[in-house]
């Protein structure tokens, strides 16, 4: 009898969740390295993007219809909130350029224009087995205010 093994994307997201929880309770940007450190004051978020088998980043939408305060936006950046089996709840991170303009990833903007990411209350449920790659980003992008 063969047992399905965990995917590397799922393992990475579970590791990110553990790292975030450890910081909340108490480098190179690989998804299994110590991205968050209490001594470095990097906060409680490891931002990341995940990709399909066609190397396409997952794009999600927040505040559709603008029923809440703030603009409608799309993003390719996420924070893991909870992993449950092969599924995960991811919160959307809204991306801004250095002029505080919201970036649109369905348009001409590229990820290289990202200056700052902010946490939101908008979430998406994903099946982690549907993704083939994960790109962890520097936690210093969260709420960044100036160039280093």
UniProtKB/Swiss-Prot annotation:
It comes from Bacillus subtilis (strain 168). Keywords: Disulfide bond, Sporulation. Its main location: other. InterPro entries: Spore_coat_protein_Z/Y. It is found in: Spore coat. GO terms for biological process: sporulation resulting in formation of a cellular spore. To B.subtilis CotY. Pfam families: Spore-coat_CotZ. This is Spore coat protein Z. Disulfide cross-linked either to itself or to CotY.
């Amino acid at each position: 009898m063969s047992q399905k093994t965990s995917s590397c994307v799922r393992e990475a997201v579970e590791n990110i969740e553990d790292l975030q929880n450890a910081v909340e309770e108490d480098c190179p940007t690989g998804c299994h390295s110590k991205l968050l450190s209490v001594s470095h004051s990097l906060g409680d978020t490891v931002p990341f993007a995940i990709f399909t088998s066609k190397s396409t980043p997952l794009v999600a939408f927040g505040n559709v219809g603008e029923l809440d305060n703030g603009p409608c936006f799309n993003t390719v950046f996420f924070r893991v909130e909870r992993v449950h089996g092969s599924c995960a709840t991811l919160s959307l991170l809204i991306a801004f350029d250095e002029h505080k303009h919201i970036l649109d990833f369905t348009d001409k903007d590229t990820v290289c224009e990202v200056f700052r990411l902010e946490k939101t209350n908008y979430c998406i449920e994903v099946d982690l087995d549907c993704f083939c790659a994960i790109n962890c980003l520097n936690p210093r992008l969260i709420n960044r205010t100036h160039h280093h």
